Amino acid sequence: LVKSSAASDVYKRQEFLKLDLNHPLRNAVEEEYALQESFKIINKYKSKYECSRAILVGHNAFFDHSFMLEACIRNNIKKSPFHSFSMIDTVSLGVLATRQTVLAKICKELDIDYDNDEAHSAAYDAMVTAQVFCKIINDFDDINSSIKC
């Protein structure tokens, strides 16, 4: 049973996130095609670096990973290039490095530019998340020395 308030909540979230599902630049492709093409690229790099599985890195990576797995099921894709349960979550890394969980706040603490107007687009969020991951990993020794248990 779908309540009208649920539809209203979805609309409010789209407004808050500035999502325009009918935007002409959206260039949506079929989900199966997008997955297959993405997996081809990932598999190419897995082969190049002799990896058996790719590790998903993301902000709230468990959320993204669950969507990816469900998309594979929907499209009858039997083998994802990603490890089935291992991933690296920049929320967890962000807490250790900055004591923050919100991507914008983590970026601020790490001196990474963050544009609220660009936020929540897949490409922008992926780029910023990659910057956060690299900054934390590359500065690990400095960050590790400041952690007190």
Q: Where in the sequence are the language-model features?
A:
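Acidic, Mg2+-coordinating catalytic module of metal-dependent nucleases/exonucleases
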Residues: 55-61, 66-67, 71-72, 104-149
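Single conserved hydrophobic/aromatic residue that forms the stacking wall/gate
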Residues: 1-7, 11
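Active-site-proximal helix-loop-helix substrate-binding element of RNase H-like nuclease domains
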Residues: 9-18, 22-24, 90-126
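Conserved DEDDh/DEDDy metal-dependent 3′-5′ exonuclease domain
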Residues: 12-92
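Ser/Thr-centric signal marking residues that sit
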Residues: 4, 90, 129
